Amino acid sequence: MKFSMRLISAVLFLVMIFVATGMGPVTVEARTCASQSQRFKGKCVSDTNCENVCHNEGFPGGDCRGFRRRCFCTRNC
């Protein structure tokens, strides 16, 4: 009887440790809104060029997207 109580206690303790490690602080990311660049001309090949144009338009970032490779500027909503 003592052995089974020790075993149950040990298993319960290990389960609690396992569950507690999965319950850390959760980070929440802001949604990202995208709009097509008004000043970018031509096919978007380089994300760096797109991002530079978007910075000039007042956006914090930008990248090339889609089949037609258009430049989209991004910001947090």
Swiss-Prot record:
GO terms for cellular component: extracellular region. This is Defensin-like protein 4. The lineage of its organism: Eukaryota, Viridiplantae, Streptophyta, Embryophyta, Tracheophyta. Confers broad-spectrum resistance to pathogens. Keywords: Antimicrobial, Disulfide bond, Fungicide, Plant defense, Secreted, Signal. PROSITE patterns: GAMMA_THIONIN (PS00940). It is found in: Secreted. Expressed in roots, siliques and seeds. It comes from Arabidopsis thaliana (Mouse-ear cress).
